[in-house]
Curated annotation (Swiss-Prot):
Keyword list, A-Z: Amino-acid biosynthesis, Aminotransferase, Branched-chain amino acid biosynthesis, Pyridoxal phosphate, Transferase
UniProt-listed PANTHER family: AMINO ACID AMINOTRANSFERASE, BRANCHED-CHAIN-AMINO-ACID AMINOTRANSFERASE 3, CHLOROPLASTIC-RELATED
Enzyme Commission code: 2.6.1.42
Organism: Helicobacter pylori (strain ATCC 700392 / 26695) (Campylobacter pylori)
Alphabetical list of Gene3D superfamilies matching this protein: 3.30.470.10, D-amino Acid Aminotransferase, subunit A, domain 2 (3.20.10.10)
TM annotation in the entry: none
Top-tier EC class: transferase
Name this protein carries in UniProt: Branched-chain-amino-acid aminotransferase
Cofactor(s) this protein requires: pyridoxal 5'-phosphate
Family designation: Belongs to the class-IV pyridoxal-phosphate-dependent aminotransferase family.
Pfam families attached to this UniProt entry: Aminotran_4
NCBIfam families, A to Z: ilvE_II, PRK13357.1
Catalytic activity, reaction form: L-leucine + 2-oxoglutarate = 4-methyl-2-oxopentanoate + L-glutamate; L-isoleucine + 2-oxoglutarate = (S)-3-methyl-2-oxopentanoate + L-glutamate; L-valine + 2-oxoglutarate = 3-methyl-2-oxobutanoate + L-glutamate
Amino acid sequence: MANLENLDWKNLGFSYIKTDFRFIATYKNGSWSQGGLVSENMLQLSEGSPVLHYGQACFEGLKAYRSQKGKALLFRPLENAKRLQTSCERLLMPKVSEELFLRACAEVVKANQKWLAPYKSGASLYLRPFVIGVGDNLGVKPANEYLFIVFCAPVGAYFKGGIEKGGARFITTIFDRAAPKGTGGVKVGGNYAASLLAHKMATEQGYDDCIYLDPTTHTKIEEVGAANFFGITHDDAFITPHSPSILPSITKKSLMVLAKEYLNLKVEEREILMDELDAFKEAGACGTAAIITPIKEIVHNNKSYFFEAPGHITKRLYDLLLSIQQGEQEAPKDWIFEVG
């Protein structure tokens, strides 16, 4: 276990740190158990578990922040619960109820309060809920038994080129993140295993990650590594890609609301052609892990596109989002879940 006293909260990075407790529920005979907290972080699975052979696994990611008053605040956990249900349906897995999901997350945060990052430290407590197919199995078919688990770890910035570091650099990849009508729109494990080679190739060239284009024409932006993309045009419009193979980002949905209702910007969710990049003065990667990471350069077909990093609007959105997540500013209804 990591030494809590020696944690450098301002330079944590994004990696696994064993905390004290995690939540586990089991699915057998057609229903989920009540579940509960355990201290052991090792799992014992049958060698026939479908998760090991056929990738029957889906997961979520959300964060808890410490408010100025010391309260633990979860950001839009109900949206994560709904997205996990969609992912479960796609892989023929039993849905985790919203009640079970919220209770599990709350119990994990309460049991690991000492790992909750200090207020305004730049860090947070990241929660990883996931569902896996387990039990004795050999053929390609859904599991009969499942585990729903939530663990947590204190984390810092996902990309090194964060909001205070001058932005990140990305290059387009020849690989597709997802197939048309595939699993790109859900958060399943196989999508991320397939991304490892593209990520490795990008980082070996000195970039922070790769940019995936649409799998049909390879002319439109889809995702930025494991995050969503947005751009700010020269006339101050917030534009973000739309495609059924893009994971519906909760952070992106939130930024669209903030850009429109708080900053009075024009907001569009539509296809974005690579040829349009010159129309953007700012660009960013957004997601639970990335929060908002400004993009300073995108390379495509040996051509570089440069952006303000961070630009004025990107910084305003970042500050606004963080102030809501940390309880400094009143949030839209149902965005903040206070853990008692």
